Amino acid sequence: MESLFPAPFWEVLYGSHFQGNLSLLNETVPHHLLLNASHSAFLPLGLKVTIVGLYLAVCIGGLLGNCLVMYVILRHTKMKTATNIYIFNLALADTLVLLTLPFQGTDILLGFWPFGNALCKTVIAIDYYNMFTSTFTLTAMSVDRYVAICHPIRALDVRTSSKAQAVNVAIWALASVVGVPVAIMGSAQVEDEEIECLVEIPAPQDYWGPVFAICIFLFSFIIPVLIISVCYSLMIRRLRGVRLLSGSREKDRNLRRITRLVLVVVAVFVGCWTPVQVFVLVQGLGVQPGSETAVAILRFCTALGYVNSCLNPILYAFLDENFKACFRKFCCASALHREMQVSDRVRSIAKDVGLGCKTSETVPRPA
């Protein structure tokens, strides 16, 4: 079994279960089209190692970046704005899913799931939670930007950090509508003499599979993207229609800067997720990736979804002056702390050497 991310509706369009979070396992198509441990010819070892290496690089870089983002927001009071509260939620979801990459990478290399039932359920649930919390959070950020740009008076009451926190809680609650059931249905089972981490679709599978697939596709991607598109269309019309959104040029620049940041984050998200969504639609039309090239492309498109989780901190550093200043302050403080530690260590060694020299000078030589 080789678990894939991030489209759990891939297999359920056709069959009884999927493995991990995205799989080609399917009981209704010819067996030679299936992607599992018994068909490792689809992916050579070198390609598997390349994909797993990409996973590990994304995992390490993404964890460092997202943890730094969360630290900066928690550490600095001025960073606790409504937009940054949503960014914190996005970083939290990305951090959780990045923690699953070592397990999924091991699964890809070995061709089976070696971590047991409990961890299988956990990884599956985190994949789904990340999928929904990310899209819902980006949607909330876009609506938040729309209110700030198009309804500045109402924004004074609506756009508060406490209300943003409440929205984040609601986002996780909504994601639980899918996350909890798939965690219950997920299990490590023996399939084709290999242990696989999979989700069993309830019977009748011919009915619930497509229903589940369509709902996931609509609510995790299409509807959020449509809402985001409407919000930004209205914002662009507003921004073109007025020279100043507020009475202050400085405040106006900040509004436009933050709006641009959110737009870029959304655009990168859609760009990273669209390829695998296209694969899902292609399979939905009955086309199965039956060649090594098709499977390899699918793997890298899946990895691209993970790459998105480590790109956001980089975007914040380049596009937001406040994040850039906080990141620079953190890095400089860390470097200064290391220099002080080295300096203290050098002084301590010098002191010890000096005491040793004094002692040797005062000890009388034997006659």
Swiss-Prot record:
CDD domains with a match to the protein in the record: 7tmA_NOFQ_opioid_R
Transmembrane segments: 46-71, 85-106, 122-143, 163-185, 209-233, 262-282, 298-319
Cell compartment(s), UniProt: Cell membrane; Cytoplasmic vesicle
Topology in the lipid bilayer: Multi-pass membrane protein
Lipid attachment points (S-palmitoyl cysteine): C331
GO MF: G protein-coupled receptor activity; nociceptin receptor activity
Recorded GO CC terms: cytoplasmic vesicle; plasma membrane; synaptic membrane
Cysteines joined through disulfide linkages: C120-C197
Disruption phenotype: Mutant mice do not show altered basal nociception, but are no longer susceptible to modulation of nociception by the neuropeptide nociceptin. Contrary to wild-type, they do not show reduced locomotion in response to the neuropeptide nociceptin. In addition, mutant mice show subtle hearing defects.
Tissue expression notes: In the brain, isoform KOR3 and isoform KOR3C are most abundant in hypothalamus and periaqueductal gray. Isoform KOR3A is highly expressed in cortex, striatum and brainstem. Isoform KOR3D is highly expressed in cerebellum, hypothalamus and brainstem. Detected in spleen lymphocytes.
Pfam name, any one: 7tm_1
UniProt keyword terms in alphabetical order: Behavior, Cell membrane, Cytoplasmic vesicle, Disulfide bond, G-protein coupled receptor, Glycoprotein, Lipoprotein, Membrane, Palmitate, Phosphoprotein, Receptor, Transducer, Transmembrane, Transmembrane helix
Any one of the GO BP annotations: calcium-mediated signaling
Domain of life of the organism encoding this protein: Eukaryota
Positions bearing carbohydrate: N21, N26, N36
Extracellular-side positions: 1-45, 107-121, 186-208, 283-297
Keyword Lipid biosynthesis recorded: no
Residue spans, topological domain Cytoplasmic: 72-84, 144-162, 234-261, 320-367
Processing and modification events after translation: Phosphorylation at Ser-360 requires GRK3.
InterPro entries: GPCR_Rhodpsn (IPR000276), GPCR_Rhodpsn_7TM (IPR017452), Opioid_rcpt (IPR001418), X_opioid_rcpt (IPR001420)
Site (Important for G protein-mediated signaling): D107, D127
Function: G-protein coupled opioid receptor that functions as a receptor for the endogenous neuropeptide nociceptin. Ligand binding causes a conformation change that triggers signaling via guanine nucleotide-binding proteins (G proteins) and modulates the activity of down-stream effectors. Signaling via G proteins mediates inhibition of adenylate cyclase activity and calcium channel activity. Arrestins modulate signaling via G proteins and mediate the activation of alternative signaling pathways that lead to the activation of MAP kinases.
Family recorded in the similarity comment: Belongs to the G-protein coupled receptor 1 family.
Name assigned to this protein: Nociceptin receptor
Source species of the chain: Mus musculus
